[in-house]
Amino acid sequence: MENKKFFTGENIKISLHFHNRSLFLYSNVNFLSNFIDAKGNLNESVTLLPFKKLDIQLNFKVPSRGIYNAENYLLEIHDLFLISSRKINFNNKFTFTVYPRNIRLPLEIQKLIDNVSNFSKNNPNTHTSDTYSYIDKYMEGDNFKNIHWKLSAKKNNLYVKKFDTIKKCNIAIYVDMTNILSLPGTFPTVTDEGLVSFSLSIIKYLLWKNEAIYLYIENLKSSSFQLENTEDYYSILSYYLEHKSLGHGNFFDKVLKKEFQTIENHKFIFIITYTILPMHAKTISKISADCENLIIFTLLDVPNKTKNLLRNTNVKVVKVTL
């Protein structure tokens, strides 16, 4: 193979080298595989001459991300008169990875994220630790509630418990992978590949801006991640390589309701989904009331009724064009 790193929809080339060591002539050679569809077969008839070598280049595209083990592939070879045929298995095995397509975020989306990032840096989300880190003598301005009475009585002086201020993650991203399989057949081009590629682009953009992220992915089975640096990006990439959309789920009215307490801990919420319906407006409005900014990215147009229901909230809905 010419390259070990490929992306969905990208042209992949495999070079095949044959040596016919027999006296027979073989015509109409076809390449069969468990990872290449009919369009990926050899485009024209190939003939293997007796005692001759032949180099063939196979061009194909893989429409879906994943790790492909190319161990089940073979040649179907017909005789000269096309009366009989036989299949020859390849002994050599190879594995290649097809990654989600890289998407450059549109300028207007970059500006949205930049505004959130700048506000986040200027307004850190902090809380006081539940346990004190050390004890010090009381000074004017210290909280009287934090006095360590037992130690103060023993030392005959006032001592206070000191608590660390902990910086909390400001930004949370919720990714809905559940509804793609329930979309009508009128949207054949809308797949989870687009959703995954877009979510990875936003995650990467934020991490490269040194933003910590709480990431929640719903795919019938929930998965959550704390992302703090660029190395964490690759753990999410690995997750997406191993997981596809599994089926329909009630993301807004069941999944997000369970997350209300966690959502309240973050000032900025991004939701990435396929679309939002009027029946989701109540849940979305409740989420928006507990955060500074709620941005929902959709792959499909949102009904006007939904937009009207969210008009007087701080919710921004962005239709993504991939």
Question: Could you say what each language-model-derived stretch is?
Answer:
Residues 139, 154, 182-184, 220, ...:
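Disordered, low-complexity tails and leader-like regions
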Residues 15, 242-322:
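Von Willebrand factor type A / integrin I
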Residues 63, 140-143, 190, 229-232, ...:
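General structural signal for secondary-structure boundaries
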Residues 111-113, 231, 310-313:
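Short, surface-exposed amphipathic charged segments that create phosphate/polyanion-binding patches used
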Residues 163-165, 205-207, 228-231, 259-263:
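Short, conserved, surface-exposed binding loops centered on an aromatic residue
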Residues 187-189, 230, 284-287:
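Short, glycine/charged-enriched secondary-structure capping and boundary segments
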